[in-house]
A protein has these predicted regions:
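Short beta-strand/loop segment at the start of cytosolic alpha/beta domains
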Residues: 2-34
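A recurrent domain-boundary module in secreted/ectodomain proteins
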Residues: 1, 160-167
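A structural signal for leucine-rich repeat
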Residues: 132-136, 155-159
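Consensus positions within tandem repeat domains that build extended binding/scaffold surfaces
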Residues: 60-62, 83-88, 106-111, 131-133
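Short, well-ordered coil/turn elements that cap or connect secondary structure elements
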Residues: 12, 138, 159-162
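Structural signature of tandem-repeat unit edges
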Residues: 21-24, 36-58, 68-81, 91-104, ...
């Protein structure tokens, strides 16, 4: 089974994954991109490859950088990390939903996504928002966060040099 580690595969001619762990107990993959420009991306919690079920735990750096058509992204609940520049410069991206287990959003992850106006963060365990992760997004962007997390997430967004925004 270990021979699958670092192997890449594409599901449904859309998203491409790289195997990061493959044992009897742990099977994980990282999303590394897509073969073509997509309008909407839903990153699932799990994918099946060769009759094995893998948890999707990460979005790699530069995975969806400069997608010209992308307007909406939904990130599954097993993803814990969004890599640096993952959605950098996606000029039409307007809505992002971040799954409940993301703990780390990389530097410049959504930098320059000028139409990004609505970000929903479902999780209560976000530990780090990288530098400029949400810089140069729409000026009136709204971040919807879990109850009791507004202050902590607001501080992280400020440290990350986020453009003007509202947290609710």
């Amino acid at each position: 089974m270990q021979s699958y580690v670092r192997k890449t595969f594409t599901i449904g001619k859309k998203l491409t994954y790289k195997v990061t762990a493959c044992s009897k107990k742990v099977k994980t993959v990282t999303v590394i991109g897509s073969k073509k420009q997509l309008k909407s991306i839903t990153i699932p919690a799990t994918v099946t490859y060769r009759k094995m079920k893998f948890k999707v735990t990460e979005i790699s750096k530069n995975a969806f950088k400069k997608q010209k058509k992308l307007t909406k992204v939904t990130i599954g609940n097993n993803v814990t990390k969004i890599g640096a520049n993952a959605f950098y410069g996606d000029k039409k991206l307007s809505k992002v939903t971040i799954g409940k287990n993301v703990t780390n959003i990389g530097a410049n992850a959504f930098y320059g996504d000028k139409k990004l106006s609505k970000v929903t963060i479902k999780g209560k365990n976000l530990k780090k928002i990288g530098k400029n992760a949400f810089k140069k997004i729409k000026k009136s962007a709204t971040f919807k966060v879990p109850k009791g997390k507004a202050k902590a997430y607001k501080n992280m967004l400020k440290k990350a040099k986020t453009s003007s925004y509202k947290v609710k």
